[in-house]
UniProtKB/Swiss-Prot annotation:
Species annotation: Conus spurius
Family from the record: Belongs to the conotoxin T superfamily.
InterPro entries on file: T-conotoxin
Principal location: secreted
Pfam family, one: Chi-conotoxin
UniProt name for this protein: Conotoxin Sr5.5
Length: 44
């Protein structure tokens, strides 16, 4: 659970970041989720 604050911050950054379209935003979101799972594997 210690990666939860990091994950929340990343989600806020994604939500506030201007995106060209929703598809690009979704791809970025998936990349960050994969990174979180690889870095903090105990959270998945």
């Amino acid at each position: 659970m210690r990666c939860l604050p990091v994950f929340v911050i990343l989600l806020l950054l994604i939500a506030s970041a201007p995106s060209v379209d929703d598809n690009a935003k979704g791809t970025q979101h998936k990349r960050i989720i994969n990174w979180c799972c690889l870095t903090f594997y105990q959270c998945c």
